Every structure is written in structure tokens, then in C-alpha cells.
Amino acid sequence: MKIRSQVGMVLNLDKCIGCHTCSVTCKNVWSSREGMEYAWFNNVETKPGIGYPKNWEDQDQWQGGWIRGISGKLTPRLGNRVSVLSKIFANPVLPAIDDYYEPFTYDYQYLHNAPEGKYLPTARPRSLISGERMDKINWGPNWEELLGGEFEKRARDRNFEAMQKEMYGQFENTFMMYLPRLCEHCLNPSCVATCPSGAIYKREEDGIVLIDQDKCRGWRMCISGCPYKKIYFNWKSGKSEKCIFCYPRIESGQPTVCSETCVGRIRYLGVLLYDADRIEEAASTEHETDLYERQCEVFLNPNDPAVIEEALKQGIPHNVIEAAQKSPVYKLAMDWKLALPLHPEYRTLPMVWYVPPLSPIQSVADAGGLPSNGNILPAVESLRIPVQYLANLLSAGDTGPVLRALKRMMAMRHYKRSQTVEGVTDTRAIEEVGLSVEQVEEMYRYLAIANYEDRFVIPTSHRELAEDAFPERNGCGFTFGDGCHGSDTKFNLFNSRRIDAIDVSGVRKHGEGE
């Protein structure tokens, strides 16, 4: 057993209001520079829809993730080593800029400088790539916001598989949900396997997947290899970049920027302990519908004395074990089984999980009360969002885990409503879904009224155990041939030439020292 720790995230889709605050703050901090105008490390999609980039879930088109061979061995869907190297100079499945969108701004200055005329001046769009004026904006990162666009395009959503999707184009059957997305920082990342230069690595101490900018050669195979399409090519620097899970903040015990600024407080951060020796076995599971359960078996119980003893022997710091015991991610994913992984069928074992959303009643005919089939809880099938759609999104098509999560949340609401509105303690609903009163009370606290310290349990890192800091003492940071080493290049991250400081200590005023 090889015990490792990972900082994971859970997003409660039942509380997401689609405000895009997480996207804007992430963009301002990490990708608001030349070459990354089109890149959104965090974006919020409206489902159903084809997403950003277009059809990112269609792995028949983009060849991301892993496939299981006849022998049971995993191979990147993009191909084996020879196959990847054979198309290194011309990748046929690489998303183009039009699959994302052409980034643009507006001629705001024209509003100030326009001469007096008969008509009001307008700020026309201008491309951030070519600098030319754009006649028409054809796509954007949130083009499908609030079900924007025609249903014919949204119907290409891969999560409609095994469903009669035509019926959901009718107004009375329309449904929608928000899906915030970021890098999954997988346990079995396919981007690492497809990088020819070996520039992508997974940090041992916290599981964050990063790209070494010194090793990256811009082959962009990682972009195709990532099934979530969360790696972006910086056309200015010639390097690939991705979400870094705000690791400078994580190392100091602070949450990521997207989590810190989330208006709906839907994000939870915590530590999970897992057995690295079981990753290959879990990812190689024969049936895709079993991948969720196999991944759960990889995680270790942080309260088990045997696990604690072995973790200490293997060098896991004590504060990391304590954080794992208080982790909201472990509670939501393992204790209560409410959180589910995004597209486990990609076999990457993702570590950003989602609590499925409860939705309104499907029709007015049910407004008087949901059908209950003789039980205390109403029939989940009568909710507006189809269970099969959520299952295709979060559990590889298996409706069992989704039904369990939805029923447990409904049972919690039924219990708290009877307690606060009717003044009685009705435990029939929670007993029906296998929960105790103590579990439901704790679920309510975490899902409804959790404090800051409940949602974010992040131990400070021990960088002294991860790497030798001595060789980095004169490090220059993130530069492109300019900066502290005094290069003559004209390139500067802030689009201006580097200006050397002038020593004025020896300059004397006129008349001094005479």
C-alpha cells in the first residue's frame, strides 16, 4: 500500500446560480495576458449544451482519456507511443481556435473620440488575435448561457445518449442546469501520458497536476489527450498552460480563487488519502458503470488506526492526516455518497466531484404533490432534470448512484422541513435512504449553513519534504528570457521593454562637497 494525499474539490450543483464570478476572478488572476485571451481555466456551462470548447465530451472526435484494450491494459485513446509520435507535427484531432472562440474586445475609446454626428457612436467588436474589426461574433465561452441558441445544436450534447432527446426540445419538457468546470487534477491523468516531452507531472504532496514551462515544447498532444479539454496553448509563449489549482494559495492553507470568491458557496476543498498502488486496477475496470465504485475503493479511511499508522510511516505529515479526518470532500463523497465524479468513463479518475442538482417538478399536473409510489419520499423520476442525463454526466450511465444522492438530499429536506415548519421530528424519510439523525444534521450543516472553516480544510504544505529548496535560492520566477538575469530581449510579460535601474547614490547636487 502506497499512501498519498490529494487536495480534492466538491461542487454542489444544487446551489450554483450561474453568476460566473469564479470564471471572472480566475481569468483576472491567471489568464488575462497576451496569448491566453481565449483560455478560461474555470468556466461555467449551461447544460444541456455542447460546451466549451465545442463538443468537448465527444471523445470519438477529440480522442481524449483512456481506452481499455482486450488484454485489460490501458492505452491513451489518442494512441500508443509510436502513434502519438507519428503525428507529432500534424495532430489531426487538435481543437482549433474556432472550436473555442475568437477572443474580442470593443472599441470603447471610439465612444470618447468620435466626432459629433447625427447618430450615436457604437463600440464595435475587435479581434484580440488579429486586431481587426469583427463583422459578427459567432461563438463564445458562454454562448449557450440560459439555453441560448437553437435546440438542434444543444441536442448534440453527448449526455443525451440512451434518451429520447427530441422530447426535451419541447417547451414543457425543457430543463437546464449549471456546470462549473476546471481541471480535474486526475489520479490517472491522460495528459501526462500523452506529453512527448514529459513536461506534465503530478505533485506527490497534494496531487496537483502542473506543466513544467521549461520542459514544455509546445507539441500540444496534451490538449488532445485531456478529455476535459482544460489545457490551453499559449500562442505567444509557445507553451501549454492549465489550471494550477492555485497551488501557491493551497500551500499556505488558503482556498483556490474560484472557491474563495464563489457567491453561492458551492465549493468545498479538503484532503483525501488514497492508495496509489490501486490506481491502475481501478482505472482498468472492465465495465464503465463500475468505475465510480472502483475509484471509491482507492480512497482510504483517514480515521482507521491502521491507515494512520501506515501513513505516518510513509512520511505523510500529521497535519495532513488531521485535515483528511475533517475533510468535507471525504464526507460528501465517501461518508454520505452525495458527490460523484465527472465522466468517470474517461478512466482518468477525476478529483473534482459534483453533487447532482435537485430540480423542480416536471409538470403542473404534479404541483399538488409528487407521486410517491407508496413511500414517504416522492418519485425522483418526476423531477424535471432526467435522471439518465445526470447519470450520463456523473456516473457513466449508471442511475443508481445518482438516485441515491438525490433521494438522500430529498430526505434531508423532508426531515428539516417537518422539524422547522411542522414542529415534529419525522425520521421515516431518512430511515428509508439509510441515514441516521446525526448524519442528516451534519449534512444540513455542510450543505446549507457551513462556515468558511467547514468548507475549506486545507493543511499548510511541507515544501521542505517535497523538494530541495537550496538550488532555487536564486530563482528568477516565471519569465520568457527577460527579467532578473538581464537578457537583451525586448519581450516583457507586461508588453514593455525591461528598464534597468539606474544607480543614483553617487550623484551629487550642484555645490555639494565643494
Q: Predicted segment positions?
A:
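Non-ligating segments of multi-cofactor redox enzymes
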Residues: 1-514
